[in-house]
Every structure is written in C-alpha cells, then in structure tokens.
Amino acid sequence: MEWGEYGKGSVWTKIIREKIKNQRDLLRQFQKKESELLDNYLEELTYRDKTNREGHAAKVYFNALFGTKFTRSAETPVNAALNYGYAIFLSSVNREIVSNGYITQIGIFHDNMFNDFNLGSDLVEPLRMIVDEYVYTHQPEEFGHNEKMALLDPVSYTHLRAHETEA
C-alpha cells in the first residue's frame, strides 16, 4: 500500500495529538499542574510536529510524574518497568496489525530498516500512558519476576476491554 506524504503526515499529527492529550489527561488525573503546559503544546502542534511539541511534552510529562532528575535512559526499576510494559503493548499492537493483514515494517513516521515493527511503533504512541499510569502508581523499587507478572495484568485487561467495546 502506498500513500502520499501528506496523508502520512496528517495521520502522524493525529497520533501525536492523541499522545499529548493522553499525557495531559494522566497528569490531570494525578492533579499535576504541568498538564496546563501540555494544553499549550496541543495548541502549538503543527503538521508533522515540525516544532517538536511531542519532545517538549514528553520532558514535562516524565518530570511531572517521576521528578526532575528522571531520565528515560537511566537504568532504574521505573525505566525497566516502563520498557517492559511498552514492549508488551508493542507486541499486542503488532499482533493486531498482522491479524488484520497489514505489514508491521512499513510505518507512518518510524522508518528504520532495522525495526521490523515501524507501524506498531507508530500506533503504540498514544497507548503508552496506560503503562505510565501503572508504573507511576506502583513506583517499583526493584524489577523482577513479580513486577513483570503484575505488568501483564493491566495490559491484558486493556486488551480485553478493547474487544468488549467492539462487540
């Protein structure tokens, strides 16, 4: 399937809009004042996010949830939980992509020849907050078997609820 660059750019902009909205909503849920900044980023969002509102929103969002010293690259139990949860979600999204007859390698924005899951990487973006919410509320001090098993529950529950609403 081939589609024009404008169409891909429009879809990517919508994905980023939903991602920032979901981040904002999670911050509001936890009564974080930084949610107002994400409102501003939503207003400033342009086609294809050429001004990198997604990046700015992510910095504000993660700092609001996990503190200003938090970085996604640090080897911490929180990051391990986030990475594990995101991987579970990505595999679920990829399973849905394949089961509907689409190819996972061809992405909307993600376009890396070494990433066999470019489309899944695009589509999972607005869903990451489900994992973020779980990790924020549990704040793991270690990341082992029990923490991995616990992360499977909210992911499975969300997947099941999506199918229930379709019926």
PLM features: residue spans?
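Extended, well-ordered alpha-helical scaffold/bundle regions in very large, multi-domain proteins
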Residues: 120-126, 134-135
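Small-residue-rich helix-loop
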Residues: 110-117
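Accessory, usually C-terminal, subdomains that scaffold auxiliary metal cofactors
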Residues: 113, 133-152
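Conserved mixed alpha/beta catalytic, RNA-binding, or beta-rich assembly cores of soluble enzyme
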Residues: 81-87, 91-95, 99-103
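Single conserved hydrophobic/aromatic residue that forms the stacking wall/gate
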Residues: 159-167
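Internal, conserved structured core segments that host functional sites
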Residues: 6-75
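Short, solvent-exposed helix-loop connector elements
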Residues: 71-80, 104-110
